[in-house]
Amino acid sequence: QNVICHAPYIINLANRKDEQKWHFSIDFLKGELKRCDLLGIKSLVLHPGSAVGLPKEEALQNIKDGLNEVLKDNFNCLILLETMAGKGTECGTNLEEIKYLVDNTSYPVGVCLDTCHLNDSGIDMSKFDDYLNIFDEKIGLDKIKCIHINDSKNVIGSHKDRHENIGYGTIGFENILNIIYNERLKDVPKILETPYVGETLEDKKRIYPPYLFEIKMIRAKKFDENLFNHIHEYYK
């Protein structure tokens, strides 16, 4: 029941300078939702989009209009708007923008928090409960349907969006544990989106998924200083 899909990045509802491209995004998103419905998948995470030269207010209105055009077809699958880092002209980088989309879309939508994106957008993840309090006041915690769990390679407010392995970034292991085990979010599905581990990313045959070992760390609530060595030993 907790299978969650992610929409392709090619979809951009924010920019409507080219009507043909905007309607392509609408049709593409409809196709994704149809496939999710056929598979019985209940949630689809969506990056809200990038303004690409438009004023942010106009871009947000385009997203809202696009969502309404898509969702009038009454899909069973719920769109989850992902919180973004603020790289380039991304929309959905703060609570005000997410709130606008949630409040003004004529159909129900949810929210997917991304811990790296929150950090890079300027949220102090050591004070995550304060953020949840504000989120609850502005939007409602019931709208949080998924959390992407990542550390970050960059400092708070960098607007860079570069994921890091759990405990090896600027958010830190303890802060991430506090998010994962937060009592108010205990029933929210959490998904690791951390990078593969390898000697060089160019050598695709020598990079390995870290998830087995990161999940072990999370369950044990103990940071593994030799995580990368253990991953290499396991896969070699």
Regions found by a protein language model. Name each.
Residues D130-E137, Y168-R184:
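A short, acidic, amphipathic alpha-helical segment used as a generic capping/interface helix at domain edges
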Residues Q1-A7, L13, K17-G31, K221-K236:
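N-terminal pre-domain/capping segments
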Residues I191-P210, Y234-Y235:
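A short, acidic, flexible beta-alpha connecting loop/helix-capping segment that sits on the rim
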Residues N12-G110:
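Active-site acidic/histidine proton-transfer and metal-coordination neighborhood
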Residues L201-F228:
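C-terminal helical cap(s) of enzyme catalytic domains, especially alpha/beta-barrels
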Residues K42, K145, K186:
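Short acidic/polar active-site loop segments enriched in Thr and Asp
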Residues D65-I166:
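Acidic/histidine-rich catalytic cores of soluble enzymes
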Residues H6, C36, L44, I79, ...:
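Conserved, mostly hydrophobic/aromatic
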